[in-house]
């Protein structure tokens, strides 16, 4: 049965999602008699004895990757779902795991947790019982190699924004991938109700970039409009000797009535002056977090304004 591979920054909510997924999949198995032969094995850094310090040097990292590979080889089988909850941030390693799955003619999916670095550092400080050293945490964020759904070893890819998404919203599509029949099962007439007709991942089972081929360009254009509006507001106040700190900037195009449901705005922080470099950095983060999500164009502006309000204040 499949390998479900979690990937993401440290302290981005992977373990919470992975354990919730175990519960949801087990509930599916318990509620579906024809799935009763399936079992779930969950592996994490903690269960495999991998410590934070093992990520410091490349030599130690090779050892921890060997631990994960060994666990997958040992446990992956026709009737066992293996969930790996680790950083898995090197694309070559994800490819290696994909090859192990392919050798068994079973299925595979990647679940990526997306989370703003500011939130990660806050969670690490306030909510993590075993916090990462800030310097190592920052290094691992810089090292991270983003999965790409166009690569077969990163597909099917489910990208989940942990501060606001819930894995229950994705569970039906994940189940369609997890419980699809393997080649051998197909030949033997296997007929699980959750896998019927799902021999290959398709648009119903995979979270892919939005339908527009230029979606990233659309994200860039819409977010750039908002940044331009904010910078023009700051410049206009500065030119007359005013102060932009603590002011509200309406960034909705063509709608200026604050009581209108279509109006959205950005509140500039009181304590410091917002710079173009700061806005561009937040824009890049926003695009990176949303490039795999299916967002209507008219929702990009309000979502980006909300993202700025959360990260500027």
From Swiss-Prot:
It comes from the Eukaryota. ATP binds at residues 8-15. The keyword Hydrolase does not apply. Its main location: cytoplasm. Pfam families: KTI12. The keyword Ribosomal protein does not apply. Keywords: ATP-binding, Cytoplasm, Nucleotide-binding, Nucleus, Transcription, Transcription regulation. SUPFAM superfamilies: P-loop containing nucleoside triphosphate hydrolases. It is found in: Cytoplasm; Nucleus. GO terms for molecular function: ATP binding; chromatin binding. GO terms for cellular component: cytoplasm; nucleus. Interacts with the elongator complex. Elongator complex-associated factor that is not a structural subunit but rather transiently contacts the complex. Regulates elongator complex gamma-toxin target (TOT) activity, resulting in G1 block by Kluyveromyces lactis toxin zymocin (pGKL1 killer toxin), probably through regulation of the ELP1/IKI3 subunit phosphorylation state. Required for an early step in synthesis of 5-methoxycarbonylmethyl (mcm5) and 5-carbamoylmethyl (ncm5) groups present on uridines at the wobble position in tRNA. Present with 5260 molecules/cell in log phase SD medium. This is Protein KTI12. It comes from Saccharomyces cerevisiae (strain ATCC 204508 / S288c) (Baker's yeast). The gene is KTI12.
């Amino acid at each position: 049965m499949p390998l479900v591979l979690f990937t993401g920054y440290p302290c981005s909510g992977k373990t919470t999602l992975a354990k919730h997924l175990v519960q949801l999949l087990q509930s599916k198995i318990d509620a579906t008699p024809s799935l009763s032969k399936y079992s779930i094995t969950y592996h994490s850094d903690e269960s495999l004895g991998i410590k934070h310090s093992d990520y410091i040097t490349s030599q130690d990292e090779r050892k921890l990757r060997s631990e994960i590979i060994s666990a997958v080889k040992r446990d992956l089988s026709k009737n066992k779902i293996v969930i790996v909850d680790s950083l898995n941030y090197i694309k070559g390693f994800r490819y290696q795991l994909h090859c192990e799955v392919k050798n068994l003619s079973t299925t595979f999916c990647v679940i990526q947790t997306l989370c703003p670095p500011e939130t990660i550092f806050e969670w690490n400080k306030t909510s993590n019982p075993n916090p990462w050293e800030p310097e190592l945490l920052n290094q691992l964020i810089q090292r991270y190699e983003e999965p790409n759904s166009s690569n077969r070893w990163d597909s099917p890819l489910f990208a989940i924004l942990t501060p606001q998404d819930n894995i229950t919203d994705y569970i039906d599509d994940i189940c369609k991938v997890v419980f699809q029949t393997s080649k051998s099962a197909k030949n033997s007439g296997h007929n699980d109700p959750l896998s019927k007709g799902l021999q290959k991942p398709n648009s119903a089972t995979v979270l892919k970039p939005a339908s527009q081929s230029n979606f990233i360009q659309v994200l860039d254009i819409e977010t750039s409009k908002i940044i331009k509006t904010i910078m023009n507001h700051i410049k206009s106040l500065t030119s007359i000797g005013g102060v932009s700190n603590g002011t509200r900037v309406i960034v909705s195009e063509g709608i200026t009535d604050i009581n209108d449901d279509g109006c959205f705005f950005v509140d500039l922080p009181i304590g410091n002056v917002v710079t173009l470099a700061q806005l561009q950095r937040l824009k890049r983060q926003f695009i990176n977090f949303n490039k795999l999500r299916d967002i209507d164009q008219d929702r990009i502006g309000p979502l980006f304004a909300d993202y700025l309000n959360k990260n500027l204040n």
